[in-house]
């Protein structure tokens, strides 16, 4: 029906007759002429309707926003002073010789042709209209281009695109599974995969050497901001590799994507920091390195002070005291400090002690704080020295269990940087390495920090069982501007070590065989050294397009309550369907 898309209409087509199809983005009457902005997938073109073309003009008079039309006409240069430099077709317009009305539109629930605040519920209910917005459509187009380039990059490097099952077995991977009842095997269930982890390892045992997949994953997680019950991963696995092989390849890919689509050079190589360094310095294992603020540990200085708020955590083996220095922060008002105190309370902090450094040259006389009277002068002097405090700064203190201090001051660090726009640079990638293999609260069972198939730096299974808290894994996360965009590891390919990890996690041999028997069997038939990584594709695209949420780069996302306003899913089903599956719905328990 058409000869061109809007973005291909330019001055090279002047005096040619072309045909366009699309929607009426905007219609304007000016001085006896009717101007129509025709919108298609690729952009906008201005169409001019002259009263001398009576049939065309009559159709144009009847048009409203979002009517679907086909326009044929000759390309003309726009009159002087009317050029629009912001669109590819901005130097020309179409003098319509024929307009066909292909379909009408009901009155719109919200405007598409201009910016308007619309609730997410309404946007998602009428997602087909929301997706017509050029800025929304552009993100999905960018997503498609990024995926296409990822495939090309990996195809050229010998990777095979292999699909893994969507209907698989429920295994304990952290989040709850989405279960699918089997009609042919009553009382038994498939699970939708949380990741292709086990299958991709088995593919390496099978000898495929380099695998990748753009794959849907499903996790029935508790509701959290900016999470989706179904999401997309770039998943890959390689044989006969070590950490550096995977990291170098993935750095090259990410650098290529940013150079290609954003014209942004990323560092070569990406910096690396250990998990321990990240937690101690930034309070998180996902540090935003654009943020110049850091945490400084002063636990050792507080072991002998009389101030119980500091002394108790300083002498608790699970405690920590850290300081966050904000340059020029002494200007903060009491209200601002109270607001930040309330903010860190979200993360379990019981308060937010502070010292304002009004004049560093006057010793304690140049300081202002309610806690000064509780601290010896030599301790205060060492705090100022260690934090490199300057006149005009403010020092915020966190004192509690290390987890609370890290999370609260880490969040405060991010909040202060955002509030005061302290960012240095635009893009700061980093690898976080040397993660603990196992983690637990003060008391409780050990859990795998990543997953139980992660290889360990310790090679003796007996030492792993004896001292699990001392064992580091061979895992690595790629973090960009405070978001983890990829995470992976070298995998265990030794059956004895795999059983040792299961033992630490409290998984008996019988339970392991029942849950992971297919993988454990495969490991005994010549498993190569292997490793891989998975990227959250939604997150990566959101970052690259500047979207505020991953929902903005997914065509049909769920809400934060895991519902689809467009289709009203999830929904009840007919009783007969349940009976066929041997299911009965019990009364919902809140």
From Swiss-Prot:
Identify the GO cellular component terms for this protein.
cytoplasm
Instruction: From the Swiss-Prot or TrEMBL record, state where the protein is found.
Output: Cytoplasm
The name under which this protein is listed is Aspartate--tRNA(Asp/Asn) ligase
The record's InterPro entries line, in alphabetical order, gives: Aa-tRNA-synt_II, aa-tRNA-synth_II, aa-tRNA-synth_II/BPL/LPL, Asp-tRNA-ligase_1, Asp-tRNA-ligase_1_N, Asp/Asn-tRNA-synth_IIb, AspRS_core, GAD-like_sf
Which Pfam families does its entry note? Answer: GAD (PF02938), tRNA-synt_2 (PF00152), tRNA_anti-codon (PF01336)
Gene responsible for this protein? aspS
Keyword annotations? Aminoacyl-tRNA synthetase, ATP-binding, Cytoplasm, Ligase, Nucleotide-binding, Protein biosynthesis
Decide whether keyword ATP-binding is in the record. yes
């Amino acid at each position: 029906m058409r000869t061109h898309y809007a973005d291909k209409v330019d001055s090279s087509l002047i005096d040619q007759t072309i045909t366009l199809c699309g929607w009426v983005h905007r219609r304007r009457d000016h001085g006896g002429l009717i101007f129509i902005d025709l919108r298609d997938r690729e952009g906008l073109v201005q169409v001019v309707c002259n009263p001398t073309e009576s049939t065309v003009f009559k159709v144009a008079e009847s048009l409203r926003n979002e009517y679907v039309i086909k326009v044929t006409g000759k390309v003309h240069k726009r009159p002087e002073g009317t050029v629009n430099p912001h669109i590819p077709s901005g130097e020309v317009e179409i003098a319509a010789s024929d307009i066909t009305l292909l379909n009408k539109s009901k009155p719109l629930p919200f405007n598409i042709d201009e910016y308007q605040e619309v609730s997410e519920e309404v946007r998602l209910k009428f997602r087909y209209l929301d997706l017509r917005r050029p800025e929304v459509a552009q993100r999905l187009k960018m997503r498609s281009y990024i995926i296409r380039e990822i495939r090309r990059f990996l195809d050229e490097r010998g990777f095979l695109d292999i699909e893994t099952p969507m209907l698989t077995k429920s295994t304990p991977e952290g989040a709850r599974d989405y279960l699918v009842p089997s009609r042919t095997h009553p009382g038994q269930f498939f699970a939708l995969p949380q990741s292709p982890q086990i299958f991709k390892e088995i593919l390496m045992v099978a000898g495929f050497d380099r695998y990748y997949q753009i794959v849907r994953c499903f996790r029935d997680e508790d509701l959290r901001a900016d999470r989706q019950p179904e999401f997309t991963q770039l998943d890959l696995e390689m044989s006969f590799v070590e950490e550096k092989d995977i990291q170098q390849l993935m750095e090259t890919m990410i650098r290529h994507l940013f150079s290609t689509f954003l014209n942004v050079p990323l560092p070569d190589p990406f910096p690396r920091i250990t998990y321990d360094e990240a937690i101690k310095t930034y309070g998180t294992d996902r540090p935003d390195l654009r943020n110049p603020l850091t945490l400084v540990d002063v636990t050792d200085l507080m072991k002998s002070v009389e101030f119980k708020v500091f002394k108790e955590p300083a002498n608790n083996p699970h405690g920590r005291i850290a300081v966050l220095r904000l340059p020029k922060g002494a200007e903060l008002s009491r209200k601002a400090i109270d607001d930040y105190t309330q903010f860190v309370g979200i993360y379990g902090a019981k308060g937010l002690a502070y010292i304002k450094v009004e004049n560093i040259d006057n010793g304690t006389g140049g300081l202002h704080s309610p806690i000064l009277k509780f601290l010896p002068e030599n301790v205060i002097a060492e705090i100022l020295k260690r934090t490199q405090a300057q006149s005009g700064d403010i020092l915020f203190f966190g004192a509690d269990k290390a987890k609370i201090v890290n999370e609260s001051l880490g969040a405060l660090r991010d909040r202060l940087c955002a509030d005061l726009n302290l960012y240095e640079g635009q893009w700061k990638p980093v690898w976080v390495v040397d993660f603990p293999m196992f983690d637990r609260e003060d008391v409780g069972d050990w859990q795998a920090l990543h997953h139980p198939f992660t290889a360990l730096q310790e090679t003796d299974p007996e030492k792993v069982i004896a001292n699990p808290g001392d064992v580091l894994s061979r895992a690595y996360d790629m973090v960009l501007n405070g978001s983890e965009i990829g995470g992976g590891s070298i995998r265990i390919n030794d059956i004895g070590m795999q059983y040792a990890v299961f033992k630490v996690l409290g998984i008996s041999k019988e339970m392991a065989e029942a849950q992971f028997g297919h993988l454990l069997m495969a490991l005994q038939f010549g498993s190569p050294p292997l490793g891989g990584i998975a990227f959250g594709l939604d997150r990566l695209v959101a970052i690259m397009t500047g979207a505020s949420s991953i929902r903005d780069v997914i065509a049909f996302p769920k809400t934060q309550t895991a519902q689809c306003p467009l289709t009203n899913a999830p929904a009840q089903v007919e009783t007969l369907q349940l009976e066929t599956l041997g299911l009965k719905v019990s009364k919902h328990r809140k």
